[in-house]
C-alpha cells in the first residue's frame, strides 16, 4: 500500500482483491467522484449495484483516516480521487456436456479512494 499523498490534507484508503469486475465498479465510482462525503453516501445507499457495498466500506475507511490522522471534519470532505484497477482473476472450471470443461474467470479489482478537505479542492 502506497501512502504518498498529493497534499497534507488528503487521506486515502484502498480495498484490494474485491470480488467484482473493474467495469462494474468504475461505473459507480464515476458517479461519486467530486461529490461531498454525505452526498456520496446517500447515492451509494440507493444505487441498485452490488459493488456499492465494498465502495462504501472503502469510502468510510478513507474518511476515518482523514478524521483520525489529519483531524479533518467529515462534513467538509470531498472525494478527490476514486479509481479501480484490475486484480488477479480466480480460475475455476465448470463441467459441460460430453466430458468437456469450460473455464470460468472470477474477476477481482483494487479500489482506491482519496478524500480532501473542501477548502483545498
Swiss-Prot record:
Disulfide bonds: none
Coiled-coil intervals, chain numbering: none
GO cellular component, as recorded: cytosolic large ribosomal subunit
Family annotation (Gene3D superfamilies): Ribosomal protein L22/L17
Keyword Metal-binding part of the UniProt annotation: no
Pfam families to which the protein is assigned, alphabetical: Ribosomal_L22
Keywords from the named record: Ribonucleoprotein, Ribosomal protein, RNA-binding, rRNA-binding
Cited InterPro entries: Ribosomal_uL22, Ribosomal_uL22_bac/chlpt-type, Ribosomal_uL22_bac/org-type, Ribosomal_uL22_CS, Ribosomal_uL22_sf
Biological processes per GO annotation: translation
Source species, domain of life: Bacteria
Gene Ontology molecular function terms on file: rRNA binding; structural constituent of ribosome
UniProt family annotation: Belongs to the universal ribosomal protein uL22 family.
Stated role: This protein binds specifically to 23S rRNA; its binding is stimulated by other ribosomal proteins, e.g. L4, L17, and L20. It is important during the early stages of 50S assembly. It makes multiple contacts with different domains of the 23S rRNA in the assembled 50S subunit and ribosome. The globular domain of the protein is located near the polypeptide exit tunnel on the outside of the subunit, while an extended beta-hairpin is found that lines the wall of the exit tunnel in the center of the 70S ribosome.
SUBUNIT field: Part of the 50S ribosomal subunit.
Protein name: Large ribosomal subunit protein uL22
Organism from which the protein derives: Synechococcus sp. (strain WH7803)
Lineage of the organism: Bacteria, Bacillati, Cyanobacteriota, Cyanophyceae, Synechococcales
Amino acid at each position: 500500500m502506497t501512502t504518498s499523498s498529493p497534499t497534507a490534507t488528503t487521506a486515502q484508503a484502498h480495498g484490494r482483491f474485491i470480488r467484482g469486475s473493474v467495469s462494474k465498479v468504475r461505473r459507480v465510482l464515476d458517479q461519486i467522484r467530486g461529490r461531498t462525503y454525505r452526498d456520496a453516501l446517500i447515492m451509494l445507499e440507493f444505487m441498485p449495484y452490488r459493488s456499492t457495498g465494498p465502495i462504501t466500506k472503502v469510502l468510510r475507511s478513507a474518511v476515518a483516516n482523514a478524521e483520525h490522522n489529519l483531524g479533518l471534519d467529515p462534513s467538509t470532505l470531498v472525494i478527490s480521487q476514486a479509481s479501480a484497477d484490475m486484480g488477479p482473476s480466480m480460475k475455476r472450471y465448470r463441467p459441460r456436456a460430453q466430458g468437456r470443461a469450460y473455464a470460468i474467470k472470477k474477476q477481482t479489482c483494487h479500489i482506491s479512494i482519496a478524500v480532501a478537505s473542501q477548502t483545498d479542492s
